[in-house]
């Protein structure tokens, strides 16, 4: 597999090839995922929960995201490396640009921001200055206290229409990739068909252009609570390398996620 770019991902969408993404936080696992064909590696602020033991992602700092980006980049040859902008690091266009520049200097090739059309000015500012952007709608973990917990979004008609509208607005502002998290399958399918850019789902059903999982969930390494949309691939294979190979295969074939992993 050659080096993955946003152009490659767009072509995959156009040709109906599914995109496999997974979180990574260090060089060792980044190399494993890269070797087994993952197209996108996300340095997620989920590290605040799965690595640091926090109850949410809000305490993760820019310095920590820069550090983990450097680690992942060292283990990656082909996959597109995307890094989360942490909580309160993109309140204004100029602040967004300064922080995104740090992540790009650390080796990221795209940054991800959570939120709707209030981000459009910052997205335009980044894209004008050479920084590719991934959007994130639905359940946005940095807004967990606004939502009152980690809950499925877009189940009523008003909320679904708002998420759909915001997806179009973010695309118009310049995002090149969109993550949809914990939304009904029907809404994710509608958005995926409406957008020209690739849509990556997590808890969003099988009709998106690709899937992403937190690596700990894919290996069944949890602290007790197991999200409905996850699958323990390690339990099926008994080997980490084989587990990721199976994940990539099932995403590519469209057999993951199954009905049991979806929200209606």
UniProtKB/Swiss-Prot annotation:
Cofactor: Mg(2+)
Primary subcellular site in the record, as a coarse category: cytoplasm
GO cellular component terms listed in the entry, alphabetical order: cytoplasm
Reactions accelerated catalytically: 3-methyl-2-oxobutanoate + (6R)-5,10-methylene-5,6,7,8-tetrahydrofolate + H2O = 2-dehydropantoate + (6S)-5,6,7,8-tetrahydrofolate
Residues the record lists as binding 3-methyl-2-oxobutanoate: 45-46, 84, 112
GO molecular function: 3-methyl-2-oxobutanoate hydroxymethyltransferase activity; magnesium ion binding
EC number(s) per entry: 2.1.2.11
The keyword Metal-binding belongs to this UniProt entry's keyword annotation: yes
Superkingdom assignment: Bacteria
Free-text remark on how the cofactor is bound: Binds 1 Mg(2+) ion per subunit.
Family annotation (Pfam families): Pantoate_transf
Active site: 181 (proton acceptor)
InterPro entries, alphabetized: Pantoate_hydroxy_MeTrfase, Pyrv/PenolPyrv_kinase-like_dom, Pyrv_kinase-like_dom_sf
Top-level EC class: transferase
Pathway(s) the chain acts in: Cofactor biosynthesis; (R)-pantothenate biosynthesis; (R)-pantoate from 3-methyl-2-oxobutanoate: step 1/2
CDD domains: KPHMT-like (cd06557)
Annotated function: Catalyzes the reversible reaction in which hydroxymethyl group from 5,10-methylenetetrahydrofolate is transferred onto alpha-ketoisovalerate to form ketopantoate.
Family membership: Belongs to the PanB family.
PANTHER family to which the protein is assigned, alphabetical: 3-METHYL-2-OXOBUTANOATE HYDROXYMETHYLTRANSFERASE
Protein name (Swiss-Prot/TrEMBL): 3-methyl-2-oxobutanoate hydroxymethyltransferase
């Amino acid at each position: 597999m050659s080096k993955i770019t946003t152009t490659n991902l767009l072509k995959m969408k156009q040709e109906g090839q599914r995109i496999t993404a997974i979180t990574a936080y260090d060089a060792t696992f980044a190399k494993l995922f890269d070797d087994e064909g993952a197209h996108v590696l996300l340095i997620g602020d989920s590290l605040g929960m799965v690595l640091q033991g926090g109850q949410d992602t809000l305490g993760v700092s820019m310095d920590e995201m820069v550090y983990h980006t450097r680690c992942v980049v060292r283990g990656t040859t082909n996959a597109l490396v995307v890094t989360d902008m942490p909580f309160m690091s993109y309140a204004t266009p100029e602040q967004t640009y300064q922080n995104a520049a740090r992540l790009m200097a650390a080796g990221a090739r795209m940054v991800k921001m959570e939120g709707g059309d209030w981000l459009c000015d910052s997205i335009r500012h980044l894209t004008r200055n050479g920084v590719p952007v991934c959007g994130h709608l639905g359940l946005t973990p940095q807004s967990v206290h606004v939502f009152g917990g980690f809950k499925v979004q877009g189940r009523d008609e008003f909320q679904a229409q708002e998420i759909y509208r915001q997806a179009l607005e973010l695309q118009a502002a310049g995002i090149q990739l969109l993550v949809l998290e914990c939304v009904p399958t029907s809404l994710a399918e509608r958005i995926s068909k409406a957008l020209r850019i690739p849509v990556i789902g997590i808890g969003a059903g099988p009709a998106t252009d690709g899937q992403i999982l937190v690596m700990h969930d894919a290996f069944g390494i949890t602290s007790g609570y197991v999200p409905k949309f996850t699958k323990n691939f390690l339990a099926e294979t008994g080997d980490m390398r084989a587990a990721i190979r199976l994940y990539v295969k099932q995403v590519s074939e469209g057999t993951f996620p199954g009905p049991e992993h979806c929200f209606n």
